[in-house]
Amino acid sequence: MLNRRECGAAVEVAARRHLERAGLRWLASNVCFRGGELDLVMYDVMSVVFVEVRYRQQENHGSAAQSVDRRKRRKLVMAAQLFLQRHPFLAQVPCRFDVVEGAGRPLQLHWIRDAFRLDDC
């Protein structure tokens, strides 16, 4: 049986593969900054996509996507800004924030494109 960290890593790998099959290109994983982390950074037809991957075995407390609250969105935006500062060639490209939620066993993935916008933070 996988512990929480191993389970999270497995869901992130599954999410990355799912997005790659959909045509996105992988740029980075688990990019850490003070105060925030980007699970996946992908590229999709002239857009940089910052992807938050969430997993819940059960939805007793809401869906995994619902757990990306205003505070978490702010952290993701700050981390994305720092990422773009370190990669200025990508800062000229539009960006968006997606969420991939995983639930259950066997794992079911649900990709939410454009899950939130900067003005939602």
From Swiss-Prot:
GO molecular-function terms, A-Z: nucleic acid binding
Domain of life: Bacteria
InterPro entries linked: Restrct_endonuc-II-like, tRNA_endonuc-like_dom_sf, UPF0102_YraN-like
SUPFAM superfamilies the record matches: Restriction endonuclease-like
Xref: Pfam families: UPF0102 (PF02021)
Coiled-coil regions listed: none
Family: Belongs to the UPF0102 family.
Name under which the protein is recorded: UPF0102 protein XF_0554
